[in-house]
Each structure stands twice: as structure tokens, then as C-alpha cells.
Amino acid sequence: MKVIFVVQGEGRGHLTQALALRQILLHEGHEIVKVLVGKSKNRKIPEFFLHQIDCPTELFDSPNFLPSKDNKRFCLLRSMAYNSLLVPSYISSINFIRKNIQESGADIIINFYEVLCGITYSLFHFGIPEVCIGHQYLFLHPSFQMPGKYPLPEFLLRVFTRITCLRATKKLALSIRDYGDNAANGIKVVPPLLRQKVKTTIRHHGNYIVGYMLNAGYAEDVKAWHQKHPHTQLHFFWDKADAPEELQVDETLTFHRINDVKFLKYMAGCKAYATTAGFESVCEALYMGKPCMLIPAHVEQECNALDAEREMAGVATDAFDIDKLKVFARGYEEDVEFRMWENYAEIRIMAAIDSAYNEYYDTTETCVYDEKKSNITIASFFQS
């Protein structure tokens, strides 16, 4: 297969999923012909992704959430108003995606939760299948229970998720556990997409806590806790664009610009992990046997945090209160079942993509055959 990736560039998760699937596809003898990544002026695509994807990569403007004034949580109304002003730019992006798909010669589109790709695929008939991948498709599964605390944002999240997969051939819902497939909605539940490096990195339990924050405003919370507990070693990662590669506040607190190799190294050796409830890094911590604390920044992360708590993978809280993480870590037990589930990820995900590919082209051939048969019948009628 010749494959084109379209990836949402917000945060780290979808980018690392694309890297993981790239490894699987190449191992199976397939080819990634092009990678398109949605970007915004508020986020910089990490260098580790641009270096490791090793494929012609182009960026396009895409909708994103704007943080609140304190740069912690996301502001829904502000984000909607901001993105509405950029509609002309997004229309240009849709045309850009259309042109690149048509010129790529790809046999299949893999969409990593990019909304403009969902719209593009619904508007134009490319004659190739689209498989959508993301943990967010679990929100459309009838067995998944939403938090229920924010009815309107939860409704809008589901609407947004449906737009990302309009007319999609298949939706792969990445999940911590097996909810079972939902054929009526075209949802296939599969293990998370973790890179091989996550599974092969030697892990041990050190004496420091590692963290990742999507919004840099949480740095003040970390500093405030650190002032009260200066003897606890902290290493926090962020994607603050104007920050140095390493900002050492003092001997026991360091902020690192997101660097994937360094992040996995620190994760493998930490005592526990604190994060703004992104799905991917929580799964990495879960696989490595690290207790987690999750601080949701928006409704999607509220869903992630609730799911993690249900699976006893972590504890949710409103702020970077690392005392809560320490208490949770004392009674934490590694989830062996998750590791077994995750070890089947490559087989299950590849089988789902192959199935979508074959079903699409088998159906297309049948439709073409039926159309030809119909045309012959009509021609025979007029000739008689």
C-alpha cells in the first residue's frame, strides 16, 4: 500500500501515534508517500517528529484550542471566536489537503484526528479509503461513559469527533482496554499506538518525578509546590516555543523543551508521572508501570482522566498537587493486563487497516461491475 498521513499537530499524542504506525507499516512492506500536519501559530511542531518521520512533510493551518488568560485550561468560547475568523485560511487548507491527496498517488488515507481532513474527505471523492485513528473515537462508542459534568462541551466534543471522520471507511478507537467493536458506527477498538522504543526501553524506579504540561501556565503551580518541597527532584517537559532546551530553576527543578528521546529516558527512570491528561503519554507511563496524576485542561482530557481513573492507571486532580501523586503511588500496582493488551497492538491495528483497504476496494470493484452490467443491459434494450 501507498499511504498518506494527515495528522493533527496539537500536542504530542497524534504525532507519536503517526511515528508508531509508520514503523508498523514500513515493517509490513508498505510505503508512506506523504505526511501532512495541521499547525497553528500557538504551537510549534516538535523537531523530533520532523526528524523521525523521514518522509516528505508539509504543514497547513488548522483549528486549535486557545488557552485561558493564565495559559492553563482551554477557553471554548475564545477558541470558537478565534477559529471563526480564520475560516478563509481553513478553506485554503482544505484545498491544500485535496491537492496533496490527489497528487500523492496514495492507495489509502490515514487520518490522525485532523478535522480538516475529515471535511475534505466528505467533500471530495478521491476513490481511496480513509481510516481514522485516535482515542477520541471511543467517545462515540455506546459503552464509553462520558464524565457528565459538562453537557455542552461533551456534546460539542462528540460533534467535532464525528466531523473528523465523515464518510470514513473505518474508525480505529485507541483504548486502554477492549470495549468490543461497534460495527453499527464503524468503530474498531484497538490497543494504543505506542512506538517500539517505549516497549524496549529499560525501565527502573528512580527517585524523581517527571511531568508533561501542554500549557505552560501550569509551570507556576509546579514552582509553588516545589518551593514547599525543595528536596523532591522534578523534571517537567513543555512545548513553550521561546523556552531554552533546558531551564534549570535550581538543583531539584528543571524544565525541558519537549524532546522525545529525553522524555522517554526520564519516563523510564522516574518514580511517578504527572501530566495534563494527554492519552498517549499516560499509556506510555502505564506500559512502563509508572503511577500517574492527571490534570485535565479541557473536556477531552476530562474524559481521558476519568477513563484512567476507572482503570486504576492514575489519579485526577485540578492542579499540579504532587502530594496526591505521592499518596497514589504508594498503593499503585502495575497493570499486567494492559501490557498484554498492548502487545497485540501491531497485529490488531494492521489487521484493521488491511480489512478497511480490502473491503473498500472489493466494494468499489462490485459497484463498477454492477454499473458496467447495467450499462450493457441498457445498451441492449436500445439496440433491440
Feature map (PLM): residue ranges:
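Conserved nucleotide-sugar donor-binding subdomain of glycosyltransferases
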Residues: 72-108, 115-116
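A donor-sugar binding/catalytic signature common to diverse glycosyltransferases
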Residues: 109-112, 265-304
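C-terminal amphipathic helix plus adjacent low-complexity
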Residues: 327-384
